[in-house]
Amino acid sequence: MLTLLKNLECYAPEHIGKNDILICAGKIYKIAPRMDNAGCGLIESADDCDGLLAFPGLIDQHVHIAGGGGEQGFSSRTSEMDATDILAAGVTTVVGLLGADGTTRSLESLYAKAKALEEQGLTTYIY
């Protein structure tokens, strides 16, 4: 499936002006000014995005995706990160790591959480 987003103010990360973005299989395939979808039966949707901005996703290199804390005991633990909250901050790639709580959190649970976030559209690494 091809989707064409037209007339976006694009940053990559510097401002590159008004461009169209062609998306193929959920990934950005091409960014260029004034792409024409006439005569191309492969584009399923073309949306006018005039007035909207497009930025590259941010990378957060230190995230306790499986939760953190625990230095003062079990009541001081924080909950797992949610993909919605991560994406709302403009972050599309996270590097997950364990916190101080080595009793209830493990590399296995960190790996499982990273895979769950990938299923929700994020790119993840663990350390």
Report the location of each language-model feature.
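Short secondary-structure capping/turn segments at boundaries of alpha-helices and beta-strands
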Residues: L8-Y11, D82
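A short, hydrophobic/aromatic-rich structural module that often spans a beta strand
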Residues: Y11, L110-E118
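Short, low-complexity, polar/charged sequence segments that are solvent-exposed and flexible
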Residues: I23-Y29, R77-E80, K113-A116
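Metal-associated gating/positioning segment near the N- to mid-region
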Residues: C49-A112
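Metal-coordinating catalytic core of metallo-dependent amide/deamination hydrolases
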Residues: A116-Y127
